[in-house]
């Protein structure tokens, strides 16, 4: 590791003038009801930001020189002004990456996307077969996602992403996912299952076993050179030598990443939609720039963090204690071990009596909110 890398990580830990990765959930409306949805999406929130309010945020992002925004939901393409907002963002030098289940990616839309140099598309797929995928994402969702990939490939869209949430039921399909990506000229992106949103209700039964975590690490080291992971799997880093696993080995919440939700609330992390991690609101707290730079929560997160119960572990520098959201939503202390700690410290903590907080909002169809 060069000396530049530790300096860069130190800079990340103290926060940047603008987020590297800004996730923006434009809507909670969704045509699917995935059992592990991190935002408990389904129904549109009546307080959803207007088109003009969204454009004001984009204007701020341009002034802050944010490179791109990662748009999700819900299913963002069902919002009536989605394409208007995409065009507005790219015209104002803010690139767009959006996540979709593929419902609106018909041949005409695929051709439109292929003609743009500023838009990246990520198709969600949680099984390399319909049987595995549809068990968590709903009947017909596999065929819908594959049809979107086919349309993008036929239109000449370069380098779509296939985004996979790794579960104990699909971790054995990693080679199949990679083959699927190759078939459509796409790049594979895999992410960690967090106990966030509806994921809190199914985490115990869906998260990979300890043996599968090791198998996942081995696969990433052996075959993951062209696989995107972001900061999803830094909790696996203690399984090998320093630098063996690509990606950022730290929690970027409030430092280099954050989330704007459909009503303008700003959270430290896309997987931590709870009052504990609410930094402010773009409408009532002076705009996004003001929240990002001055919110007390973000200032706190950018201070040196205590290693807590993990301080005596020789692997702390590798994983930094793991994922904040995973700990919080399983009822574990934030300065304790990750629930999936590969050194085995998470399992005893999970076995103790604990209170797991519930997500702040639930827009699932059938919920009362």
Curated annotation (Swiss-Prot):
TM region positions: none
Which residue stretches belong to region Disordered? 347-369
Tell me the cofactors it needs.
[4Fe-4S] cluster
Q: Does the keyword Chaperone apply?
A: no
| Residues annotated for [4Fe-4S] cluster 2 binding in this entry | 251, 258, 269, 323
Binding-site list for [4Fe-4S] cluster 1:
30, 34, 37
Q: What superkingdom does the record give?
A: Bacteria
Share what the entry says about its subunit structure, partners included.
Answer: Interacts with MftB.
| Assigned protein family | Belongs to the radical SAM superfamily. MftC family.
Query: Its biological function?
Result: Radical S-adenosylmethionine (SAM) enzyme responsible for the first step of the biosynthesis of the enzyme cofactor mycofactocin (MFT). Catalyzes two reactions at the C-terminus of the mycofactocin precursor (the MftA peptide). The first one is the oxidative decarboxylation of the C-terminal L-tyrosine of MftA, forming an unsaturated tyramine moiety. The second reaction is the cross-linking of the tyramine with the penultimate L-valine residue, forming a five-membered lactam ring. Its activity requires the presence of the MftB chaperone.
Supply the name of the protein: Mycofactocin maturase MftC
**Organism source for this protein?**
Mycobacterium ulcerans (strain Agy99)
Taxonomic lineage from the root:
Bacteria, Bacillati, Actinomycetota, Actinomycetes, Mycobacteriales
């Amino acid at each position: 590791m060069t000396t530049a890398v530790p300096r860069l990580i130190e800079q990340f830990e103290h926060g940047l003038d603008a987020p590297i990765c800004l996730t923006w959930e434009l809507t909670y409306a969704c045509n699917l009801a995935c059992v592990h949805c991190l935002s408990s999406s389904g129904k549109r929130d009546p307080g959803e930001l207007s088109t003009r309010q969204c454009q004001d945020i984009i204007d701020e992002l341009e002034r802050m020189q944010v490179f791109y925004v990662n748009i999700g939901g819900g299913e963002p393409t069902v919002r009536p002004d989605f394409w208007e907002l995409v065009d507005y963002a790219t015209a104002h030098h803010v690139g767009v990456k959006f996540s979709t289940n593929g419902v609106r990616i018909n041949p005409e839309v695929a051709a439109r996307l292929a003609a743009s140099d500023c838009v990246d598309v990520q198709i969600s797929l949680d099984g390399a077969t319909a049987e595995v995928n549809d068990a968590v994402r709903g009947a017909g969702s596999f065929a819908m996602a594959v049809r979107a990939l086919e349309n993008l490939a036929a239109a000449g869209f370069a380098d779509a992403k296939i985004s996979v949430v790794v579960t104990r039921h699909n971790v054995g399909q990693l080679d199949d996912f990679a083959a699927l990506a190759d078939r459509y000229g796409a790049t594979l992106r895999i992410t960690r299952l967090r106990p966030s949103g509806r994921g809190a209700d199914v985490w115990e039964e869906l998260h990979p076993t300890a043996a599968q975590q090791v198998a996942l690490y081995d696969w990433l080291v052996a075959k993951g050179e062209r696989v995107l992971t972001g900061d999803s799997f830094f909790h696996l880093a203690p399984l090998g030598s320093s630098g063996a696993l690509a990606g950022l080995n730290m929690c970027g919440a409030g430092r280099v990443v954050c989330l704007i939700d459909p009503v303008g609330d700003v959270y430290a992390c896309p997987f931590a939609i709870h009052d504990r991690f609410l930094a402010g609101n773009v409408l009532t707290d002076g705009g996004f720039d003001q929240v990002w730079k001055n919110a007390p929560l973000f200032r706190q997160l950018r201070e040196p963090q205590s290693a807590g119960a993990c301080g005596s572990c020789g692997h702390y520098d590798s994983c930094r204690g793991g994922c904040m959201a995973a700990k919080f939503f399983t009822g574990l202390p934030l300065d304790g071990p990750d629930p999936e700690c590969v050194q085995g410290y998470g399992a005893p903590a999970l076995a103790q009596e604990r209170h797991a907080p519930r997500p702040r909002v639930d827009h699932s169809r059938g919920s009362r909110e």
